[in-house]
């Protein structure tokens, strides 16, 4: 396939193909936006004729996503859930609370936190996604959760603050598996609380952002 051969009919056919695969509207829009960006770059490099633009007047509407944020009061209910017989669910509860208290810290950043990230009364780390350095005050509630798992982590020889990843340098596939398991447990917690939408690590982040804007 050559970009110079791209025309409006092919774009429409591609949209139809993606929709036929059962992809959500926003996912289809992401694919088309990426294709359009690539085509625009080719235009700038004079690799395709600028006289014809296959995306002209093509409106990509984003589907309205369900409101995902939950009120801060629900995190108090989550903290009170008793799951002494299921340490993995208990861990997911603790991680969701820690994320909310840590200004919506992403799961990936929590997973890779080590004792070296603790500087006095602050957490100093780099965002896994952007590399940006973050300095965050460790509140008493956050410190309580860190201490809860400290002895267990030392006993296993792990420098990570939380028992999400095995000691050493786990591969990305291991992290993705841990994230999937975490979200599956959060979904069960959300069902227990009868939340209208699935409860995930993203919901935790979105909830903190919504509270911060109040």
Give short role names for the model-derived ranges.
Residues 1-66, 81-84:
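N-terminal core-binding DNA-recognition domain of tyrosine recombinases/integrases
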Residues 11, 35, 98, 110, ...:
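Short, basic/aromatic-rich helical patch in the C-terminal catalytic core of site-specific tyrosine
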Residues 4, 48, 61-80, 132-139, ...:
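DNA breakage-rejoining catalytic core of tyrosine-based enzymes
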Residues 52-107, 111:
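Basic, Lys/Arg- and aromatic-enriched nucleic-acid-binding interface segment
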Residues 84-87, 183-214:
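Short, basic (Lys/Arg/His-rich) helix/loop patches that form interaction surfaces
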Residues 40-49, 99-120:
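Short, charged phosphate-coordinating catalytic segments
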Residues 75, 140-196:
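Active-site/catalytic core of tyrosine-dependent DNA strand-transfer enzymes
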Residues 5, 112-148:
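Conserved tyrosine-mediated DNA breakage-rejoining catalytic core shared by Y-recombinases
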